[in-house]
Every structure is written in C-alpha cells, then in structure tokens.
Amino acid sequence: MDDLRQHLRGTTALVLTPDSPGYAESIKRWSDTCEKKAAAVVLPTTAEEVSLAVGFATAHHIPLVVHNGGHSTSGASASEGGLVISLARMRGVVVDPAAKTITAQGGTIWEDVDRAAAVHGLATVGGTVNHTGVGGLTLGGGYGWLTGRHGLTIDNLLAATVVLADGRILRASETANADLFWALRGAGHNFGVVTEFVFRAYDQPNEVYAGLLSYPTHRLPEILAFVNTFEDEGPAQQDQGIFFGFSGDSILAAIFYNGPRAAAERHFAPLLALQPTVNTVTMIPYEQLNTIQNPFATYGGRKSFSGAFVRLPLEVGFFQELLDDYQAMIQTYPEASRTAVLFELVSHTAVLRVPQAAMAYATRGPFYNVGCVFRWENPGLDQTMRAMQQAMMRKVGDRAGAGAHARAYANYSHHDGRVKDVFGENLPRLQQLKGKYDPNNVFKKWLNLLPN
C-alpha cells in the first residue's frame, strides 16, 4: 500500500496496514463475525481526504467499504482484502441553538450528538443505543424514542455533504441536488460517503422518565394486555414508548415518557404494579436516555441482527409460542442465551405524515419494528444461528406482520435481504439514480441496488 500512502501524502489522513500499530483496533466491529482483514484502513479527517481515498480505490479497482459505527452484522462496513474508509477521526458536532440545527461529521456516534445538543437544551431523533453510528442509522431511516413526536431521523435531515464514487463532493438538500438528497434518505449507503449531516433540532429542556423493567415469563399475558392499549392513548402516545420482549429467562421492557414523573407513573401503573424483579426507571437527562439499552448491546461475540414488522394487537397465544421457540433455542444452544427479541413500540403518527414517495425510505405504515439480535460464540454455529433467526422473524412477519408491502426495515435487514422488500415502489427510481451517481456500483456492500 505504498502507492496509497504516496497518494495521500501531504494530508492528515492515516493509512493503516496489517503491520501498523492501531490496525487491529481499526478492524474491530460490533460483531466478531464482521472482523475482516482489510488490505488497508484509511482514516481521513476531511471530505477532500475521503475523495482522494475513494479515487485511489476506484482507479485501482480495489473493493471499498465505509466504516462509521460498525454495527452492521451483514458485513457492510468490513472488507476482506479491500480498502476500508474509516470515519473514526471525523466526530465533530456543531450546534446552532438559534437556528436549532445540529451539524455532525460523518464519523460521529449518537452519544456525540446527544451530548452536544443537550448543552443547549436541544435534541433530535437518534439511535436508542448511543454507540451506534450516526451515518449508518440515518441513511437507512432511523427510529428513536422521539420518533413518535418528530418522525424518523431522515425526516429531520436538512442537508448532507457526500463524496461520490467519481470523487466529486456535493451538497445535497431539498434545494441542491434534490434527487441525490431523495436517495440519501433511506438508501444513502449506496450513493457515496456522507461526511457531514445537518439535522433539525428540538427543544428538550426537561428530564424524561425512562429505564428498564424485568419480569418472570408468567407475567406475559398481563404485559401484553398493557402493550395492546398503546394505540388507545391518542395523541399522548407521541411522547411515550415501550420496547419489550425477551432475553434469557425474563421478559424485558424499556419504557420512556417525555413528561413529568407523576403523569408517567400514572401511565405505566399497570406495568409497575406487576412487581418487576428489576426496576431502573427514574427521571434522567435526555442525553442518558439512549444509554439504557447499552448493557444488552455490548461489543464482542458473534451477532446477527434481523427484524420484522408487527401490528397491534399482539395475541397471547402467538407470543407464548414465540417465547417457547426462543427458550427451546437457548436450551439447545446455551451460548446463545444473550439473544434478545424486542418489539419496539413508538408512535407512527409523525412517520405517516411523510408520503411514501417523498424519499427513498419506503416502509412507512401503521406498524412497529421487531428487532432480533442473536448472539453466540462458536464460529461453527454461524449458519445455524442465522437460519434459526430468519425462521423466527418469518414467523413473526407471517403471523403478526404488516403485510407483503412492508417486509423489512432497511436497518434491520438480514444478510440475504431483498432490495424489493426494503424499497418497494421506490426501487425503480433508486436504480435510475444509482446509474446517474454511481454507475460502476462502487458502493454496494449494503443492500446492493444493482446486483446484476
């Protein structure tokens, strides 16, 4: 890679090869299944340096991937023998409290954004695990605890700076390169390297009521009875949420209420009365909200992330069957006991305000995400775990799902996810724009738009 170093000579970019200090850390990912031996890792600090790295890769026909948070379990941010552009040195955040905007560099994680915005009493819709990369979550849609009030992360994206496959650096917004901006919001991983995001921010001066609850599994019918009232709350549901499901031998619930303690405790009284074995719920600053699930989303070990959509009400019989399947799996494979399945209820009211064709993201509807993280240690179980996970998510989609038109949330799509399932009616326009902005399909590791 001497030619690459020469190509970047005079810049502040770092080039790491397998014999470089720091290389091993640079290829670590959230899942050990995605730790690949890249030929080189480039760590730029500017869009111009990103452009140089992209240009080198394309000129020498070197496979290229982009790394931000590294949470993809499909390997989208890892490369065996190719070039990784890691944005880890681009984590600056600038908040404009007067304009209520947040400008975040492409390598930021949500912790960076949450903390910077909180200084000014502001927040935006971000990831519910705060070490997730801003770039990956945003470009695939982006659900968060504030989605009920403010929509998806992409609904709050005002502008982006992107490096294209041909090295050009473009600003994209509703008024500049609007077709590219349309594509970035939902399928952006396929169009270039986004080095800067500008988000709309909202006042968030108050603390929020949030935390974790854990129950023995016999509480399942009572928990579902409460969950199935979620849509009965009317407009009030926009400021609350509950993620619930199972991990190990327990039913877990992460709850959120954007308002005073007294109102929150009234709302969640049916859950609190069930005598949870663990209760960490209290009033916390908003910037701590997206840490409450971190203990279940640690780095290390082998992982596979997948998902489905569901509608309410959820039937006790079906959910018990799903729980039985899960418990049988961890009894057969005890090392998978940290596997978690979460049903994520945040209001879709604001999400549905945006038309389906307004941007590339194509799975808006009156349904909710299910996130499923299988965790194990033995590489020999990779295919078995993925197959069992997919069977479980197919069962969820078939029995409690949202219909054939909405099969997959992009950020929860699996290794073999079909682009038609993710982008639906927006796929033809996406493929046309792909031909315009990346005709040689340089950016293809995440839901390949041009598989042929």
Swiss-Prot record:
- Note the superkingdom of the native organism: Eukaryota
Q: Which cofactor does it need?
A: FAD
Domain (FAD-binding PCMH-type) spans: 34-204
Tell me the keywords, alphabetical order: FAD, Flavoprotein, Oxidoreductase
Q: Which GO terms describe its molecular function?
A: FAD binding; oxidoreductase activity
Q: Does the keyword Mitochondrion apply?
A: no
Q: Its annotated pathway?
A: Secondary metabolite biosynthesis
Family annotation (Pfam families): BBE (PF08031), FAD_binding_4 (PF01565)
Which E.C. number(s) belong to this protein?
Answer: 1.1.1.-
Q: Is Heme found in the keyword set?
A: no
**Gene3D superfamilies in the record, alphabetically?**
3.30.465.10, 3.40.462.20, Uridine Diphospho-n-acetylenolpyruvylglucosamine Reductase, domain 2
According to its UniProt entry, what is the function of this protein?
Answer: The subsequent chain release by Dieckmann condensation (DKC) could be catalyzed by the TE domain present at the C-terminus of pyvA and/or the alpha/beta hydrolase pyvD, installing the tetramic acid moiety.
Protein family according to the UniProt entry: Belongs to the oxygen-dependent FAD-linked oxidoreductase family.
Name of this protein: FAD-linked oxidoreductase pyvE
What is the source species? Aspergillus violaceofuscus (strain CBS 115571)
